[in-house]
């Protein structure tokens, strides 16, 4: 299965109101502080590339979520300043970033060089505002795949509905020209009669969505996440991009221990 990884701010991470309050740390939604998690699920999304082969995939996650250190298959982050309950927390993190595709991923990229996802090193600041959190970040490619950076701000608001926790979120991000051009640009040697050469500049994207966490018991839970991303014109004007409007819907089952 060819997997297209969308660059969205929201990841499908578990939460459970029976065992712990849902909380935001280092720009992520967590529960079960101090426990391990094993998680499986699936997601479907809008096509990012024109004539894309697949726009769905399985989701697997495993890791440990601690007080300051969190490490799982989505990345590693560490809070180095501040404590739970403080207005400001600062953290650093490593995370996967970008879009992986080759010429077999979509008809629109036939004959183009393979693009690879990368690993970014970033800095994060969480600012607590009651039940809400403003989370800012800056991250840069450390493997020299796209040689670019991303920066942005997200707002999360934790709502306790009794049986479930609801976390609406919204944000804005900026992707540098190096980032956008690597993934969505078309080199002169890749141009065809149907696919013109294209250089993508830096641009903003906007996202909003929600995460719903339903605890079955103290160990098991079900989560459902939906998000919408509006891509900037420097990305959507690319001849290989399908649409500015990107939707993602996913669900997971998680076990905490």
Curated annotation (Swiss-Prot):
Compartment(s) of residence: Cell outer membrane
Main location: membrane
CC per GO annotation: cell outer membrane
Keywords for the protein's UniProt record, in alphabetical order: Cell outer membrane, Membrane, Signal
InterPro entries referenced in this protein's UniProt entry, alphabetically: MipA, OmpV
Keyword Signal in record: yes
Family: Belongs to the MipA/OmpV family.
Protein name stated in the entry: Outer membrane protein Omp26La
Organism name: Vibrio anguillarum
